[in-house]
Amino acid sequence: LVVRVLLYFYIITNHMKKLLFISAIVFLSCAFTQQKKTKVIFFGDSITELGVKRDRYVGYILKMDSMLKVQKKDDQYELHGTGISGNKVYDLYLRVEDDVLTKNPDVVVVYVGVNDVWHKTLRGTGTDADKFEKFYLAILKKLKDRNINAILCTPAVVGEKTDYSNPLDGDLNLYSNIIRDIAKKNSLPLIDLRKKYHDYLDKNNPDNKDRGILTYDGVHMNDAGNQFLADAMWKTIKEIK
């Protein structure tokens, strides 16, 4: 009888060990196969700085976060904003190492150009077109050297009039064309905000107002503008593999 009991105990113990071993293998397998989140950094000026705030309006990056939760994709993406008010392209170049590369992102959305144009008349400290292109390309080289996916954005608006009577429309178009050419020559995804905003305003600004449709001051986004920006950016970001 004692032998039978011991044999039974041995069989049960062995069976339990096997079950525990199998459970451990399954657990570790799930842990290691868990999908790594795609880290996205939005790199830009005050529009991006406001993108992570809830001050006057909910910023576009926060809106995108909410969109991801609704779509049940928040376990797939990690969004970060590194925007500084007043920044131009050379400011981004000077801080790309500390604010972007050290964070090891998978995707960087480069959204700059408004201040390079706007500050020429506002403060006399804009960026000449040739220098803008050189600094922009230098930023992209740093990203490419680290195998980071770059998404380019054209500057949207400085004034919302649709008849091209905003004082800086000409320069904005010029700098947007520079970014378009860079994207085309380097086979990089482009979010053409300049075109998207103009197309939207053309249909939704019948009184030709200089602000109040997508921006509260002609430059910075109101609630509708932040949502428009979030939708436009997400459409491209989700295609990056």
Where on the chain are the PLM-derived regions?
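Acidic, Ala/Val/Gly-enriched low-complexity intrinsically disordered segments
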Residues: V2-V5
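Positively charged n-region of N-terminal signal peptides that target proteins for export
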Residues: T13-L19
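Sec-dependent N-terminal signal peptides
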Residues: L19-L28
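Alpha-helical transmembrane segments and their juxtamembrane interfaces
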Residues: F27-L28, D55, D202, A232
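Alpha-helical cap/lid subdomain in secreted, periplasmic
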Residues: Q35, M67-D75, D91-K241
